[in-house]
Amino acid sequence: MFDAYLYELSWMLAALFFGVGMGTLTGIIPGFHVNNVALILLALAPGMLSLGIPLSAIAGIIVSTGTVHTFLNYIPSALMGAPDADQALSLLPGHRMLLSGNAARGVAWSARGSQLGLFLSLPLIIVARIAFGPEL
């Protein structure tokens, strides 16, 4: 029984680390969204299942990729593709912050906002677990 628990835990840890890597890539590369990775993983899911990878590990990859993506997706919009000074007012707030020298502060506040949203959503996970039962 304990071996089955360790087997599942090892797959979830591997999925977590793989998802963190994929989320970092999708968050840093402009135009490469986390939904693309989720779609690719869902398309490859039958092959992954036939290789013995549990469905919970595939779901763990998707969830961890999405979580890391939310923390990092502000960085390219704040630090890349900055317009000229006369165009900055008509574009994204991240560009205005970059031109005024406050891009690092904007990235930090975006990460804090993502972290706060994550912490505030944790009680909802408990409610969903109670509402849907132990076997999600």
Question: Where are the regions a protein language model picked out?
Answer:
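Helix-loop-helix hairpins and the membrane-proximal interhelical loops
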Residues: M1-L55, P134-L136
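Alpha-helical transmembrane segments of multi-pass membrane proteins, especially transporters
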Residues: W11, A15, N35-L42, A57-T65, ...
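C-terminal ends of transmembrane helices
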Residues: M22-L25, N73-S77, H95
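Hydrophobic/aromatic residues within the transmembrane alpha-helices of Major Facilitator Superfamily
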Residues: L25-I28, T67, F71, Q115, ...
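Juxtamembrane transmembrane-helix boundary signature
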Residues: I29, S64-L89
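Membrane-interface alpha-helices at helix entry/exit sites of multi-pass transporters
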Residues: G52-S56, R96-G113
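Flexible loop linkers connecting adjacent transmembrane helices
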Residues: A78-G106
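Membrane-embedded alpha-helical modules
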Residues: W109-L136
